[in-house]
Amino acid sequence: MSAQNLSFVLQGIHQVKFEDRPIPELKDPHGVIVNVRFTGICGSDVHYWEHGSIGQFVVKDPMVLGHESSGVITKVGSAVTTLKVGDRVAMEPGIPCRRCEPCKAGKYNLCYEMAFAATPPYDGTLAKYYALPEDFCYKLPEQITLQEGALMEPLGVAVHIVRQAAVTPGQSVVVFGAGPVGLLCCAVARAFGASKIVAVDIQKPRLEFAKNYAATAIFEPAKVAAQENAARLIAENDLGPGADVAIDASGAEPSVHTGIHVLRTGGTYVQGGMGRSEMNFPIMAACTKELNVKGSFRYGSGDYKLAVELVASGRVNVKELITGVVKFEEAEQAFKEVKAGKGIKTLISGIEA
């Protein structure tokens, strides 16, 4: 597949094609051009491919997919000082305005004018070349491969979730959903010093993976009331009056309910997974236990940097999550396999410059 800037473009629901797009130009002296080498497939990419929208974000025009990427710098702007041609980088795919109140408060993930890759109307990173500001590219140390570099994005999500939960050494943490983000939440919680980390899922293979990866225990919920599952979860894992922290990385309503009920009084609940836009919520339990209930969205200041440091130091292993790598021209087949639930994290190889 030879082209100037071959890109994997979503045309409509289940309609994708390879298209040669213009090579991006350096419009900012602080910008860089990256030759994208590896891109992970995220659930949001698959959702756009399957449904053409996620909530208010609707694909109206052809859009390049992908946002979990790593690559090699091929061009730098005149004012770039931290990177040079040939540097290997993890690519943070959301560029904030830097001017609005959330940005100025240090919460740029909540930017009112966020330009996020593969979120309409912005093109994603499944292309030969992609342009970014230099400060949204994180130089990879020698011990981190480009394949691992592509997982800094979901790891950044997990870092943000665990930071929202303010996990501290010795705490007990229950993580609902043993997909890539849930598994990485287990790993980050462990790196932060949590003593008990219980992974919860309804799929046995994922639970077994979690047990061998970063969870200290696993739990398969039964088809019973949330309070009953929570009581059994607490008893089987010796959580005393309840867990200190519950993280939902599934977006499933039964998990949300069980997560609230599994917590001790004054515990912390963080919603990291996105499910239906509206669902029932056990508000009485949240109030009477005076829980700290928080949302978590993407990643913010310092999250990507910490993600790289956690992998570089050996405290988090992302290599184990990579269960498949496909060629760029096989991208659509990879989407089908991810939709079918095969593997943990599939990467698409880029086109080397």
Swiss-Prot record:
Pfam families: ADH_N, ADH_zinc_N
Cofactor: Zn(2+)
EC number in record: 1.1.1.9
Pathway(s) the chain acts in: Carbohydrate degradation; L-arabinose degradation via L-arabinitol; D-xylulose 5-phosphate from L-arabinose (fungal route): step 4/5
UniProt KW keywords: Carbohydrate metabolism, Metal-binding, NAD, Oxidoreductase, Xylose metabolism, Zinc
Origin superkingdom: Eukaryota
Binding site for NAD(+): 177-182
SMART domains (alphabetical): PKS_ER
Tagged with keyword Manganese: no
Record field: transmembrane: none
Reaction catalysed by this enzyme: xylitol + NAD(+) = D-xylulose + NADH + H(+)
Cofactor binding mode and count: Binds 1 zinc ion per subunit.
Record's keyword annotation contains Glycoprotein: no
A single GO BP: D-xylose metabolic process
Residues at which Zn(2+) binds: 42, 67-68
One example GO MF annotation: zinc ion binding
Function description: Xylitol dehydrogenase which catalyzes the conversion of xylitol to D-xylulose. Xylose is a major component of hemicelluloses such as xylan. Most fungi utilize D-xylose via three enzymatic reactions, xylose reductase (XR), xylitol dehydrogenase (XDH), and xylulokinase, to form xylulose 5-phosphate, which enters pentose phosphate pathway.
Family assignment from sequence similarity: Belongs to the zinc-containing alcohol dehydrogenase family.
Stated name of the protein: Probable D-xylulose reductase A
Species whose genome carries this gene: Aspergillus terreus (strain NIH 2624 / FGSC A1156)
